[in-house]
């Protein structure tokens, strides 16, 4: 009887994992077929921008494809940005941290982000709303360079020109800006080196951000409410994969 019991326990474990993986399904609006933004081979759907080198000029290979995933060195500030603008969509992407941290954020909490509804000229950083990716705070909102959002507490936050303001994720504990930091109250990231699932629902001017199946933040009256999507290089090595966008059904 030991073998069947062992298989039964294993099955329960797999079912538990599936429950976690699909925990947000009831929160996701009906959507169409996926648009694969990254196919594991190249950056067909993206441009690159680096603060020191400009558009589509990456001499130091800050962005690359390694074993079917995107490698971001983090050594220069910049981003991968979609060539196309989007509105009303469900975005899925996975990320994991590498090891390196670099000036001006050497030794600080590893930092990146997905900026969406991006409008205006290419620069560091353009008008947008950000799905923050940072050790101890993944899921925060940042409103950048005129980007604006009304947070879950009903307070509207507008990012001043040339800078940004934050709305902490729901249930966030105290934060410390050091490499490797983890939220002692409600950490949403998996342990360092493991893949994390990020999900974004942008429906009209309403946005929801999920980290590993849990609602991390929610906002309304987003400005802008459409635009390009970018993935940051901001002083920390990390990897992205499985980037897919699903248009919401009308």
PLM regions with names:
Residues 1-7:
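N-terminal secretory signal peptides that target proteins for export/translocation
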Residues 24-250:
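Carbohydrate-interacting regions of secretory-pathway proteins
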Residues 10-21:
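Bacterial N-terminal signal peptides
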């Amino acid at each position: 009887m030991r073998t069947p019991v062992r298989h039964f326990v294993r099955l329960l474990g797999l079912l538990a994992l599936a429950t976690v993986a699909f925990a947000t399904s009831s929160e996701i609006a009906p959507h169409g077929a996926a648009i694969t933004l990254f196919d594991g081979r190249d950056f067909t759907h993206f441009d690159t921008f680096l603060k020191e080198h400009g558009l589509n000029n990456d001499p130091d290979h800050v962005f690359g494809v390694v074993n079917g995933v995107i490698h971001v060195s983090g050594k220069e500030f910049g981003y991968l940005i979609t060539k196309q603008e989007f509105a009303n969509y469900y975005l899925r992407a996975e990320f994991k941290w590498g090891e390196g941290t670099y000036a001006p954020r050497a030794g600080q909490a590893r930092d990146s982000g997905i900026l969406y509804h991006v409008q205006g000229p290419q620069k560091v950083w353009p008008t947008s709303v950000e799905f923050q990716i940072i050790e101890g705070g993944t899921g925060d909102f940042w409103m950048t360079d005129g980007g604006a959002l009304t947070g879950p507490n009903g307070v509207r936050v507008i990012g001043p020109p040339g800078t940004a303001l934050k709305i902490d994720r729901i249930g966030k504990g105290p934060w410390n800006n050091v490499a490797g930091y983890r939220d002692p109250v409600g950490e949403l990231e998996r342990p360092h080196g493991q893949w994390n699932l990020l999900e974004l629902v942008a429906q009209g001017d309403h946005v929801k951000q999920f980290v590993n199946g849990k609602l991390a933040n929610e906002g309304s009256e987003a400005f802008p409410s459409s635009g390009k999507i970018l993935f940051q290089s901001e002083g920390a090595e990390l990897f992205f994969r499985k980037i897919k966008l699903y248009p919401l059904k009308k």
